[in-house]
């Protein structure tokens, strides 16, 4: 089976259109006929699909018409015109889509010798900043065309489809089609799904698509000589799994002509390293007699997956839950009759996909929207301003500079140069949405109006060039303050005045200067007196700030200690954590992600907290970097990663035994307790979770990640009203509903961590009857069976009294009412008792095996267990 669909088959086939479904709407469909004149549209006769012009979705390109011949009148109508791109390297269609929506994206290419050169066009096709495929539009036959199709979840509300010139031939395209799919269909563990085939098994020669197929999948007929086709006119009902195969597809099927032989379907991947998914469609379409049975084994590459009996006149879809690799790139699905079956195996249809990874993150969505609004406002026609503004780097927009940390972090725009660009009108307000901008150059244009105050809100902005325009008025006070306090350099024409500044008379200058000298002298003497008083006091403490030089590093030093960010330890909402060395000692370096909108606030909070608090169970801050938008935190290195890695088995090696889990819980509780009662003012962590509990060389536990921490008032009824922050599954429901933050919010989160350590269950697991761990634990507790709750990786190496006490404590911590939860002092005390009970039992039972273990879990709301 060829891995690339030839659209000649589609063009030559007659589409099957069922009159009963002609009323299907095309909501969410995008159907572009590339090259169609502006404002024109039509209904394609073979599919009833409405096609519109592509003019509003592309900035460049020229239109062409295929050469007429005897077959022209029979081909797919969107093939008759096309758009080609003789100018520029990258030309991109920009489509408005719904972020997070799963789409079937189809691009169609039909050469038709439009240029009279008989030259096969070859070029690359990109989806956003990532390569999708290489296109080779064959010219061997005038009917040949190529379709490239993919199932993809959109990352933003803008989708860029780009044609990239790779040689001497000119990229071209005939049509673009987008069809929204149901969110829970065609799900890959990672990446997107590149279509290889949609086959239905029949001896017909008709292709089937919309309106019979509500998703507009194009089903091609397929058969093999050793197969026999069967069909029915009876309606086959669909199953609610969302795949909705058309009646014309599911009413036909193939069986092996030799009833004792298997039904085998084989396909080839482009590379032996590729991964694939197969979707098999089954429905029993024969009326079986009482003594007839159809049951068969489904094997993939020789591995027996399931014994299956098709449902009578009801369609079901089966697929491999994990991607399949095939030896030598040759994949095989085989249906073999079981011993008790009287009938041969049957299959109605199959869809084949290969997995394609799109690793490069798109540029920050808000900044893409902003830069495109700027482009629209000023009618900029720069040919490079298409697609993603930052990546791939070789296609970045002229005049735009970006900070690209790694492929998993969205790039940020840090410099915009629009000098000598013929700009007119006022300075665009969209510029303020480029929140990481360091330099802005709008010089030598025809801009009018005043210098806008919003420029002062762009915190990283260091240089602004506005000379050579027709601006008027004065520099806003906020910008003058930035010049004075932050070192901002603002270049404006002489007619732009500074507010509050006048030319004083010479005698006034002399008087003011004299008074100033006296005032300065007095202030200096007062400051010296105050400083000496403070220095002599042993009870007063100087609060550390971000200006402490002994722990502040330059960004170049951060790069040096991480060997230019060579080894990644992990990633989180703040950014990427790298391994490094400082004075021959290992350190962990957390670098702020440019995409974090509250990154600097959290960074500052964490530095200020860790500079003033010290506890054996809080991770130590070695230093920090605060250099423009380059922010980093340098911590002590924790050799054994975080708790969740060990509970989930991602660290490999031996698992944590029961006593180790209790010790880790105790030490974590002591760290939280110190924040609650040992700090002045007291602090709430707000993001207690298993990934924020780090483990040292000897598995000593330390709490980390203080970016969300907040101070709180002391008192039983005291709370802080604040926006909700934290991690789903660990959030205190009372905090979530009322925005009331207290130390009991940390207690709730710790209860979830404790429940993870006890049960070995994920916090949220959709495959469970009860998705959330608390609900699951409550249902298990109703049976009073401790073994059904405890992590099976513990292999029953725990004491029931110790484990019950720990479980009851966890459920108490996650009580819906914060007033019913214990404080962290009591939690630490109770956990110590759990460990003492366990150790006492071990001493009394020296012959027990001490197997090690591992676990994972978390959830929302629950009650104290009553079963025992």
From Swiss-Prot:
Ranges of the Extracellular topological domain: 24-510
Catalyzed reactions: L-seryl-[protein] + ATP = O-phospho-L-seryl-[protein] + ADP + H(+); L-threonyl-[protein] + ATP = O-phospho-L-threonyl-[protein] + ADP + H(+)
Catalytic residues of the enzyme: 687
Keywords: ATP-binding, Cell membrane, Glycoprotein, Kinase, Leucine-rich repeat, Membrane, Nucleotide-binding, Phosphoprotein, Receptor, Repeat, Serine/threonine-protein kinase, Signal, Transferase, Transmembrane, Transmembrane helix
Modified residues (Phosphotyrosine): 635, 735
Extent of the LRR repeats: 412-435, 436-458, 460-482
Record: residues binding ATP: 569-577, 590
Protein kinase domain residues: 563-832
Topological region Cytoplasmic: 532-868
Family from the record: Belongs to the protein kinase superfamily. Ser/Thr protein kinase family.
Entries under PANTHER family matching the protein: MALECTIN-LIKE DOMAIN-CONTAINING PROTEIN, OS07G0107800 PROTEIN-RELATED
Protein name: Leucine-rich repeat receptor-like serine/threonine-protein kinase At2g14510
Organism in which the protein naturally occurs: Arabidopsis thaliana
């Amino acid at each position: 089976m060829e891995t690339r669909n030839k659209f000649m088959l589609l063009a030559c086939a007659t589409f099957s259109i069922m009159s009963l479904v002609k009323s299907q709407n095309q909501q969410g469909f995008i159907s572009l006929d590339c090259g169609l004149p502006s404002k024109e549209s039509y209904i394609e006769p073979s599919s009833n699909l409405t096609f519109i012009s592509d003019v509003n979705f592309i900035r460049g390109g020229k239109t062409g018409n295929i050469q007429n011949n005897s077959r022209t009148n029979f081909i797919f109508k969107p093939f008759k015109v096309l758009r080609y791109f003789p100018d520029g390297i990258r030309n991109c269609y920009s489509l408005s889509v719904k972020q997070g929506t799963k789409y079937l994206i189809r691009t169609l290419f039909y050469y038709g010798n439009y240029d009279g050169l008989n030259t096969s066009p070859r070029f690359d096709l990109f989806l956003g900043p990532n390569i999708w495929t290489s296109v080779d539009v064959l010219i061997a036959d005038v009917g040949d065309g190529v379709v490239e199709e993919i199932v993809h979840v959109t990352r933003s509300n803008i989708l860029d489809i780009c044609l990239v010139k790779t040689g001497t031939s000119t990229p071209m395209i005939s049509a673009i089609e987008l069809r929204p799919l149901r969110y829970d269909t065609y799900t890959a563990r990672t990446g997107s799904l590149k279509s290889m085939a949609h086959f239905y098994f029949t001896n017909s020669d008709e292709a089937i698509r919309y309106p019979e197929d509500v998703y507009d999948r194009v089903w091609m007929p397929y058969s093999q000589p050793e197969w026999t086709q069967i069909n029915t006119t009876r309606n086959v009902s669909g199953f609610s799994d969302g795949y909705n195969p058309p009646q014309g597809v599911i009413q036909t099927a193939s069986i092996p002509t030799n009833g004792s032989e298997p039904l085998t379907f084989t396909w080839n991947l482009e590379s032996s390293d590729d991964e694939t998914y197969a979707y098999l469609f089954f429905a029993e379409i024969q009326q079986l007699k009482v003594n007839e049975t159809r049951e068969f084994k489904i094997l993939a590459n020789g591995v027996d997956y399931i014994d299956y009996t098709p449902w009578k006149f009801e369609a079901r879809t089966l697929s491999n839950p994990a991607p399949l690799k095939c030896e030598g790139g040759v994949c095989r699905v085989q249906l073999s009759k079981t011993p008790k079956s009287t009938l041969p195996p049957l299959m109605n249809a199959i869809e084949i996909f290969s997995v394609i990874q799109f690793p490069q993150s798109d540029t920050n969505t808000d900044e893409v929207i902003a830069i495109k609004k700027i482009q629209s406002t000023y009618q900029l026609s720069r040919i490079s301003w298409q697609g993603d503004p930052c990546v791939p780097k070789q296609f970045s927009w002229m005049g735009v500079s970006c900070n690209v940390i790694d492929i998993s972090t969205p790039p940020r725009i840090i410099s915009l140069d629009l000098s000598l660009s013929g700009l007119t009108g006022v300075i665009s307000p969209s510029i303020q949405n480029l929140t990481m901008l360091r330099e802005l150059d709008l010089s030598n244009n025809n801009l009018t109006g005043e210098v806008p105050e919003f420029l002062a809100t762009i915190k990283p902005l260091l240089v602004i060039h506005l000379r050579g325009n027709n601006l008027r008025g004065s520099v806003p006070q906020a910008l003058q303050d930035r010049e004075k306090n932050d070192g901002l350099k603002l270049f404006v024409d002489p007619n732009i005045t500074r507010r509050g500044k006048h030319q004083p008379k010479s005698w006034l200058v002399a008087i003011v200067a004299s008074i100033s000298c006296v005032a300065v002298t007095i202030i200096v003497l007062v400051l010296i007196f105050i400083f000496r008083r403070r220095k002599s006091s042993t009870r007063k403490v100087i609060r550390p700030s971000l200006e402490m030089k002994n722990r502040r590093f330059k960004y170049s030093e951060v790069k040096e200690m991480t060997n230019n960010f060579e080894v990644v330890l992990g990633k989180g909402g703040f950014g990427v954590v790298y391994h490094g060395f400082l004075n021959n000692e290992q350190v962990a370096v957390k670098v702020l992600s440019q995409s974090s909108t509250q990154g600097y606030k959290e960074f500052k909070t964490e530095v200020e907290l860790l500079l003033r608090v010290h506890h054996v169970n809080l991770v130590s801050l070695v230093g920090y970097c605060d250099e423009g938008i380059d922010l980093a935190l340098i911590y002590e290195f924790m050799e054994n990663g975080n708790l969740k890695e060990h509970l989930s088995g991602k660290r490999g090696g031996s698992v944590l035994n029961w006593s180790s889990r209790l010790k880790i819980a105790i030490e974590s509780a002591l760290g939280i307790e110190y924040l609650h009662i040992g700090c002045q003012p007291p602090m709430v962590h707000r993001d207690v979770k298993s990934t924020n509990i780090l483990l040292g060389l000897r598995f000593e536990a330390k709490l980390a990640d203080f970016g969300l921490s907040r101070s709180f008032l002391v008192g039983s009824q005291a709370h802080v009203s604040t926006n909700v922050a934290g991690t789903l599954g660990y959030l205190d429901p009372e905090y979530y509903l009322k925005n009331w933050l207290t130390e009991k919010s940390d207690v709730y989160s710790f209860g979830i961590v404790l429940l993870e350590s006890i049960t070995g269950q994920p916090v949220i697991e959709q495959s469970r009857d009860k998705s959330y761990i608390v609900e699951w634990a409550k249902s298990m507790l109703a049976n009073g069976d401790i073994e059904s709750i405890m992590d099976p990786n513990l292999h029953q190496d725990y004491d029931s009294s110790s484990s019950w006490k720990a479980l009851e404590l966890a459920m108490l911590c996650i009580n819906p009412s914060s007033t019913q939860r214990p404080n962290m002092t009591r939690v630490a005390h109770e956990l110590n008792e759990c460990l003492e009970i366990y150790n006492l039992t071990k001493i009394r039972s020296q012959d027990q095996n001490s197997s090690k273990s591992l676990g994972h879990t978390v959830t929302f709301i629950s009650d104290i267990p009553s079963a025992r």
